[in-house]
Curated annotation (Swiss-Prot):
It is found in: Cytoplasm. It is an enzyme of class 6 (ligase). GO terms for cellular component: cytoplasm. UDP-N-acetyl-alpha-D-muramoyl-L-alanyl-D-glutamate binds at residues 23, 25, 150-151, 177, 183, 185. A motif (Meso-diaminopimelate recognition motif) lies at residues 402-405. Its cofactor is Mg(2+). Pathway: Cell wall biogenesis; peptidoglycan biosynthesis. It comes from Pseudomonas aeruginosa (strain ATCC 15692 / DSM 22644 / CIP 104116 / JCM 14847 / LMG 12228 / 1C / PRS 101 / PAO1). GO terms for molecular function: ATP binding; magnesium ion binding; UDP-N-acetylmuramoylalanyl-D-glutamate-2,6-diaminopimelate ligase activity. This is UDP-N-acetylmuramoyl-L-alanyl-D-glutamate--2,6-diaminopimelate ligase. Its EC number is 6.3.2.13. Its main location: cytoplasm.
Length: 487
């Protein structure tokens, strides 16, 4: 819906109607407001002339360090600190969509996708239609449209919330990345619930240190107007976060600390999933779930905490849990029965790989086999760490390519190799498709095979090109072929 330019930027010398907002000059159409900000790869101000040529009605640009501007009849508005204001500007344009929603923000190194999808499924079952914004895309559970970033840009976030609200959402479960918090992509949103899963090494190529990474995550828990914080006490940083005084309600959860608001005892992990006694100030209840692994029990507690924070009764929440499924590519089960059990998981950090391998060990009647690689152009420090973890926790390890991006596959594998104490016992096979086929073909019926790193991804990025590739499809093909040699 068009909006007056002066409603967005009162300092504009001339008022006119704005049809849409855009940060990308390539997508400008007549009547749009082009927002020109410096970015990591491109400076939007270098594309002002292009935006004007395509019919931009006006341009707002970052004033600091701006060079000479092209001549224009359209208003050109200089704004100091424009990037930090984008979320608020977009909020005004799209009618402050977060204000009329129960907005649940989920942050942490691992578990964001699982927790947000568990919350969304549970709310749907409880009668509150819930949208999703995150790594697997945006939309409603079972019908997500894929996106490139965990937390979209500030304009896309607000536009997405407006679209979801218009489509009937009364709540939205949003993955909130450290990048998104640090860059102000969610700055003007009205979060009701903030969930913290865990903090471990990741994104140090961007943040520079664990302290900076932690500080970015912590912003969500001091959010203005926040109703409830849901925090994992089994995490060192979580305990620190829970100890900080805030106005919002605090719900803590733990698998080990009986003083937590939500605490599990007598947890049992079997082929049917998870069963545990949930102890809370509201009383005890039986938690049942088809999900696999200890960390998924932690994810379930995070989801229960968010739902309690929204005011749902514990009994109603527990009744939804047996119906909740894990996301595609997150501890996803393939095969099993008269074939090896193959598990596809997105684990691409040392902490996530360790948790997945530990979670799968009780399910392996025989060997636990692990395939992994590391992404190119990303934190190289985690490569040897992941090697050491795989060597310690798996019976057999196969190292392959992940997304090499613009980095040489051989260089990535050489970094990984440094972490093995006995690299001669490890198989190195760069072609991921061949590696998956080889490992599954070598598995026995009682073995568990973990394919780690890519999860839901339907591509492999090599030399900047995304080629169609799916671990799930490759595994299904290998399992079908497994019948022949093992029949």
């Amino acid at each position: 819906m068009p909006m007056s330019l002066n409603q967005l930027f009162p300092q504009a010398e001339r008022d006119l109607l704005i049809r849409e907002l855009t940060l990308d000059s390539r997508g400008v159409r007549p009547g749009d407001l082009f927002l020109a900000v410096p970015g990591g790869r491109q400076d939007g101000r270098a594309h002002i002339a292009d935006a004007l040529a395509k019919g931009a009605a006006a341009v707002a640009y970052e004033a600091e360090g701006a060079g000479e501007l092209p001549p224009s009849d359209a208003p050109l508005i200089a704004v100091k600190g424009l990037a930090a204001q984008l979320s608020a500007v977009a909020g005004r344009f799209y009618g402050e969509p977060s204000r009329g929603l129960d907005l649940i923000g989920v942050t942490g190194t691992n578990g964001k996708t699982s927790v947000s999808q568990l919350v969304a499924q549970a709310l749907d079952l409880l009668g509150e239609r819930c949208g999703i914004v995150g790594t697997l895309g945006t939309g409603f559970y079972g019908a997500l449209e894929s996106g490139r970033h965990t937390t979209p840009d500030p304009l896309a976030v607000q536009a997405t919330l407006a679209t979801l609200k218009q489509a009937g959402a009364r709540a939205v479960a949003m993955e909130v990345s450290s990048h998104g918090l640090d860059q102000g992509r969610v700055a003007a949103l009205g979060f009701d619930i903030a969930v913290f899963t865990n903090l471990s090494r990741d994104h140090l190529d961007y943040h520079g240190s664990m302290e900076a990474y932690a500080a970015a995550k912590a912003k969500l828990f001091a959010w203005p107007g926040l109703r409830c914080r849901v925090i994992n006490l089994d995490d060192d940083f979580g305990r620190r976060l829970a100890g900080e005084e805030q106005d919002s309600e605090l719900i803590t959860y733990s698998l080990t600390d009986s003083s937590a608001f939500l605490y599990c005892r007598e947890a049992r992990f079997g082929d049917a999933g998870i069963e545990a006694a949930l102890v809370t100030p509201h009383g005890e209840g039986l938690l049942r779930s088809p999900l696999l692994g200890r960390f998924n029990l932690s994810n379930l507690l995070a989801a229960v905490g968010a739902l309690l924070g929204l005011g749902y009764p514990l009994g109603d929440i527990l009744r939804t849990l047996p119906q909740l499924q894990g996301p595609v590519g997150r501890m996803q089960r393939l095969g099993g029965g008269d074939k090896p059990l193959v598990v596809v998981d997105y684990a691409h950090t040392p902490d996530a790989l360790e948790k997945v391998l530990e979670a799968l060990r009780p399910h392996a009647a025989a060997r636990l086999l692990c395939l992994f690689g590391c992404g190119g152009d990303r934190d190289a420090g985690k490569r040897p760490l992941m090697a050491a973890i795989a060597e310690r926790l798996a019976d057999e390890v196969l190292v392959t390519d992940d997304n090499p991006r613009t980095e040489a596959s051989a260089a990535i594998i050489a970094d990984i190799r440094k972490g093995f104490a006995a690299a001669d016992k490890v198989t190195f096979l760069p072609s991921r498709g061949e590696a998956i086929a080889h490992l599954i073909a070598s598995a026995a019926v009682d073995d568990v095979v973990l394919l780690a790193g890519k999860g839901h991804e339907d591509y492999q990025e090599i030399d900047g090109v995304r080629h169609p590739f799916s671990d799930i499809e490759q595994a299904e093909r290998a399992l079908a072929a497994w019948e022949v040699p093992h029949a």
